[in-house]
Amino acid sequence: MKRIVSAALLMTCLLTGCGMSGLLPQGSTHAASQNELYAAQTAKETHELRPQLMETQTVCLWAREQLPEELQATYDLLDHTAAVHGEEPVQVEATLEEVRRCLSALRIDHPEYFWFDGAASYTTASVPILGDSTSVTLTYTMDAETARSLKPQVDAYEKACFDTLAAAQTDYQKILGVYQYIIANTDYVLDVQDQSMICVMTEHRGTCAGYAKTFQYLMLRLGIPCTLALGTGEGSESHGWNIVECGGDWYQVDVTWGDPVDETGAPGTSLDYT
């Protein structure tokens, strides 16, 4: 969702959290067979042998930190599976609802997994004494070979952006520089199916999710803590923006609304500190 007319680099001190209701990954589920559960038990070892397609960021894992401690292990296993584009089912000791919470958190924390949008299929089982378990098979928007082939373009976009920050000395200057670079090099379009950062970086176009994930990725690469916020904008339309740390405080930044168009369709850049 993009607001027409003036909009914002919203640098508003964060006083409330970001809700994730209505944003849980979708998938199918059925009762587990013994063979399926056995296959899921061996998936972790299989995935550990594979290289990551992109370096996994650990600068800011805000959504993971909101999970109960017992679910963070489930998150970590699904995290590694997504990082290596693992296609085998993974068994976790969690209910279906808990798995979906972990996948939502994973989607928020890791913009670098541009091949994964939180989708998965599920096989559930409930064993007396042992409790609930779920076999999870992640699904991807592209195959591993395609994702790997796009990494040089991601690296080139990052370099081009960071080259413009040569004079930036403070985190604020870096935040503003990345914000302005994305706006100057991206066209907002509604017909983009891909909601990751890859369309912004390779085709220079995207929706609010693409803007926000690109900003988040670049902040994390600079070592600046940043997370993704998902909610609604004007008109109750779904919207994505960022929350970034600067000078010890957390602020909201909306790159999409900082890249407005007026009623004539003319582009522009907007800065609004509130």
Please name every model-derived segment.
Residues K2-A8:
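Sec-dependent signal peptide recognition
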Residues L9-G17, M219:
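Hydrophobic core
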Residues G210-T274:
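Hydrophobic/aromatic-rich core segments of domains that either
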